C-alpha cells in the first residue's frame, strides 16, 4: 500500500511540474498595444500616442546556492524588429523642430537586457504621463489607463547587457 501511495504522489508531482513549467497562465513576450505620452523640450504641449511595445513573460532561472555558484543571466522581453514613426507636435515655437519619433514594436524576443534598445531599470512611477511638471495635469484630454506596462526607451547609453549581481 505504501508503494502505491508513493507512486501516486510521484505521478501527481510530475504532472504538476509539467503543467507549471509550461506557464500557461502567463502571457509570453510579444507586442502589445500601449498609449505613451510624447513631449519635447521647448514645445508647450504633451500628447498621447498609440503604439506597440514589447511586454510579457520570459522564462528565467535562479540558483538555489547563489553565494557558491555564479549568477545566471536573466532574459527580458526585448524588441526584435522595430519601426519608427514620427508625429508633429502642435504649437511648437519657431526654431524648435516639432517632429518627435517613437518606436513601434513589430516583433519581440526574450534576450539579455541591452541598454541600447531597452530601459533595463524598474518601471517609472507614471510611464504614461509627461515628465515636465507643467503638463502633469493636462497631458491629454483623456487620462491613459494606469495599468499599462512601462514603455522601453530607444536608444540607450550603451550596448552592454545587464547581468544580475
From Swiss-Prot:
PROSITE patterns: GLYCO_HORMONE_BETA_1 (PS00261), GLYCO_HORMONE_BETA_2 (PS00689)
Alphabetical list of SUPFAM superfamilies matching this protein: Cystine-knot cytokines
Coarse class of the protein's main subcellular location: secreted
Record keywords: Disulfide bond, Glycoprotein, Secreted, Signal
Cell compartments where the protein resides: Secreted
Function: Beta subunit of the human chorionic gonadotropin (hCG). hCG is a complex glycoprotein composed of two glycosylated subunits alpha and beta which are non-covalently associated. The alpha subunit is identical to those in the pituitary gonadotropin hormones (LH, FSH and TSH). The beta subunits are distinct in each of the hormones and confer receptor and biological specificity. Has an essential role for pregnancy and maternal adaptation. Stimulates the ovaries to synthesize the steroids that are essential for the maintenance of pregnancy.
The protein's name in its UniProt record: Choriogonadotropin subunit beta 7
Species assigned in the record: Homo sapiens
Encoding gene, per UniProt annotation: CGB7
Amino acid at each position: 500500500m505504501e508503494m502505491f501511495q508513493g507512486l501516486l504522489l510521484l505521478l501527481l508531482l510530475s504532472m504538476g511540474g509539467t503543467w507549471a513549467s509550461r506557464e500557461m497562465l502567463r502571457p509570453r513576450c510579444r507586442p502589445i498595444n500601449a498609449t505613451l505620452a510624447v513631449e519635447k523640450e521647448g514645445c508647450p504641449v504633451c500628447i498621447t500616442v498609440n503604439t506597440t511595445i514589447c511586454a510579457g513573460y520570459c522564462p528565467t532561472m535562479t540558483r538555489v546556492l547563489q553565494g557558491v555558484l555564479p549568477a545566471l543571466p536573466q532574459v527580458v522581453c526585448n524588441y526584435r524588429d522595430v519601426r519608427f514613426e514620427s508625429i508633429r507636435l502642435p504649437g511648437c515655437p519657431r526654431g524648435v523642430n516639432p517632429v518627435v519619433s517613437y518606436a513601434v514594436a513589430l516583433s519581440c524576443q526574450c534576450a539579455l537586457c541591452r541598454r541600447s534598445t531597452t530601459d533595463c531599470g524598474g518601471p517609472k512611477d507614471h510611464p504614461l504621463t509627461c515628465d515636465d511638471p507643467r503638463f502633469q495635469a493636462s497631458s491629454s484630454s483623456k487620462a491613459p489607463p494606469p495599468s499599462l506596462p512601462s514603455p522601453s526607451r530607444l536608444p540607450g547609453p550603451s550596448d552592454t547587457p545587464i547581468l544580475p549581481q
